[in-house]
Amino acid sequence: MSQSAVSFQISPVSKAQDPLIQQQIDLKTKPPGALGQLESLALQIARVQATDSQQTDQPQNTVLKIVHPTMLVFAGDHGIAAEGVSIAPSEVTRQMVQNFAHGGAAINVFCRQVGFRLEVIDCGILTPVEGVEGIIDQRLGAGTGAIHLEPAMALETVDKGFAMARDLIERHHQAGCNLVAFGEMGIGNTSAAAAIMAAIMQLDVIDCVGRGTGINSETLERKLMLIELALLLHQSALSGPKSVLACLGGFEIVQMTGAMLAAAERKMLVVVDGFIATAAALVAVQIAPNVRDYLIFAHQSDEQGHLRMLEFLQAKPLLSLGLRLGEGTGAALALPLIQASVNFYNQMASFSDAGIEAVV
């Protein structure tokens, strides 16, 4: 039975109240713009939440909220990893998924610290983890095809992944969540992300490929060669963003893309982590440009292609810490800044409230 095509209806955020929202920000007890990027972030969040509620209240009566923030970590294996494009073998994907489930990874530590709920989704690792609670089964296969030899997956598998992702987001939306963050785990997925980036942005592979988790120069050369072979092999089939995912993507990248689209469809805030998550966002924006309004980019990673993708998406990340771990770690660390932008908007006194002469 074939999987029917999945589409998303994503509304752009309303900018009708921008002048009033900006006035609300500017009248806080500070010089205009003194809170820097937190101010533009507050404006973005206010737009999204005003669009969601379709409220007619004046912005001064609007309270911004972050409710049940949830970190979704999508895991999948990649056929190209068998060619030695990473410092670790594919078996490490499964081992790290177990580590997530047992609470021992960096993402677990950071989620506990900042207040994220964490959910781990098996999108298609080589061997499923049996008998361990806390892993959601959304398997699309046992690892993708090796993209330099064959498509990563069938086009209908992309739609199946999108449908699964939409159901996942709907469950969290029904539970009241209004902010989801995206992380991943998959040995070889920087190769898939770099291939996606090169295909969509029409760049040379060398401008997209980095050292991932820290590969040496010999491995880097092999990685470059294999991605170039993949792009050459699939050149005639890369007719659109879904085809790019089918030919070059990963099961976890597919489901991240679908989940970002589904979250924007439900007018939820979407926090994007690093290089791989940004590649998923890149595809999502190609499918539905309005999704960009809902995306908050957490950080600029140490992966050399990430800055180019961020610039292409006109994104200014909140953090730049030299991270190259993935898992959603940068997105987790950005949550306190997102909450700070909400808190200053809601709680900071205006000049008139405080009896202070306005600073212009």
UniProtKB/Swiss-Prot annotation:
The active site is at E327. It catalyses: 5,6-dimethylbenzimidazole + nicotinate beta-D-ribonucleotide = alpha-ribazole 5'-phosphate + nicotinate + H(+). The keyword Glycosyltransferase applies. Keywords: Cobalamin biosynthesis, Glycosyltransferase, Transferase. GO terms for biological process: cobalamin biosynthetic process. GO terms for molecular function: nicotinate-nucleotide-dimethylbenzimidazole phosphoribosyltransferase activity. CDD domains: DMB-PRT_CobT. SUPFAM superfamilies: Nicotinate mononucleotide:5,6-dimethylbenzimidazole phosphoribosyltransferase (CobT) (SSF52733). InterPro entries: Nict_dMeBzImd_PRibTrfase (IPR003200), Nict_dMeBzImd_PRibTrfase_bact (IPR017846), Nict_dMeBzImd_PRibTrfase_N (IPR023195), Nict_dMeBzImd_PRibTrfase_sf (IPR036087). It comes from Shewanella baltica (strain OS195). PANTHER family: NICOTINATE-NUCLEOTIDE--DIMETHYLBENZIMIDAZOLE PHOSPHORIBOSYLTRANSFERASE. Belongs to the CobT family. Catalyzes the synthesis of alpha-ribazole-5'-phosphate from nicotinate mononucleotide (NAMN) and 5,6-dimethylbenzimidazole (DMB). The keyword Acetylation does not apply. Pfam families: DBI_PRT (PF02277). HAMAP family: CobT. This is Nicotinate-nucleotide--dimethylbenzimidazole phosphoribosyltransferase. It comes from the Bacteria. Its EC number is 2.4.2.21. Pathway: Nucleoside biosynthesis; alpha-ribazole biosynthesis; alpha-ribazole from 5,6-dimethylbenzimidazole: step 1/2.
